[in-house]
């Protein structure tokens, strides 16, 4: 979608963007405020290319530091009482699985990656937010911890599980487009190695996007043929 928007294949007449914090000029961020949700990676592209961009916020401040959306991309700022509940970004899928079959699958996947030599110093990976992929991350962390190694960067959607690995030194950075829980949202504001990026930087195939550097991706699915 980011590629289609940037190429002109998809045209946006007006973009209404909820932002947890903004200033009167339109600089906006998801890092802070009572509704802090983390990265605004998808909103970055829409707000830049839309004919008209409207920022809707429940935390209007004098100045925004580390903005995701700059005032040069914004036409209107609309203060409201509430843009939503940030607790809603943390769904029941975001956590280690307790299903014994999924745990075994995750364990086997982690062991396969280790035996194949993929889990090593500096390797780059992406996690889905489902229970099985996050459980794979647990096994990866154990392997890295045991060997005293660290991965390179991880690509988010970021979760508290990923940010925990970052804080422990098991990975060196997180590139984040969409933050999946409130723990990760807090990390984005406080940790300089937790880096916000646009959806285009994440996966636009016409650019040198971060997915070009992935060694492995772990995704969960409800059904696979």
Where are these regions (language model features)?
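Conserved alpha/beta enzyme-core scaffold
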Residues: 1-225
